[in-house]
């Protein structure tokens, strides 16, 4: 199993991402439920454009963040750190993605917030179940 396969398998089992954006003067982080797309190596999430992080991001922004489990046992720690690009997904592109998101999180059907994409460009996965401090790294730039 290559690094992206192992990372993707774990990410597909999680559901909350913490992501951070900045505007040159300040940084702000937010949490969201996400849908992971293995083919695009991207997260899809809902967030209001009028939120603090939505205003900072505009329609396109650099982003960094984490996805982590909640174990209390050091030997079982697993988590992802990432960097990439946050983009507001416009219609009609957002329609099929939004339907997939709604299937995973049915409560989202009543939410009017738009869909965003976090395109992952660098992923570092720490997986202590493979040995203490074991890291798997994936870089989009190396895939071209």
From Swiss-Prot:
Protein name per the record: UPF0306 protein ESA_03544
Family: Belongs to the UPF0306 family.
Organism: Cronobacter sakazakii (strain ATCC BAA-894)
InterPro entries xrefs: Split_barrel_FMN-bd (IPR012349), UPF0306 (IPR011194)
């Amino acid at each position: 199993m290559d690094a992206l396969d192992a990372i993707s398998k774990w990410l597909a089992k999680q559901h909350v991402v913490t992501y951070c954006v900045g505007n040159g003067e300040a940084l702000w982080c937010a949490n969201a439920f996400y849908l992971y797309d293995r083919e695009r190596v991207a997260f899809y999430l809902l967030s209001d454009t009028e939120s603090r992080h939505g205003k900072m991001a505009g329609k396109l922004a650099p982003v960094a963040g984490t996805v982590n489990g909640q174990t209390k046992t050091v030997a079982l720690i697993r988590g992802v750190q990432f960097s990439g690009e946050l983009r507001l997904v416009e219609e009609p592109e957002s329609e099929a993605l939004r339907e997939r998101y709604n299937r995973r999180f049915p409560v989202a059907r009543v939410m009017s917030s738009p869909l965003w994409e976090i395109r992952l460009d660098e992923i570092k996965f720490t997986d202590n179940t493979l040995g203490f401090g074991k890291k798997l790294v994936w870089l989009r730039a190396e895939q071209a």
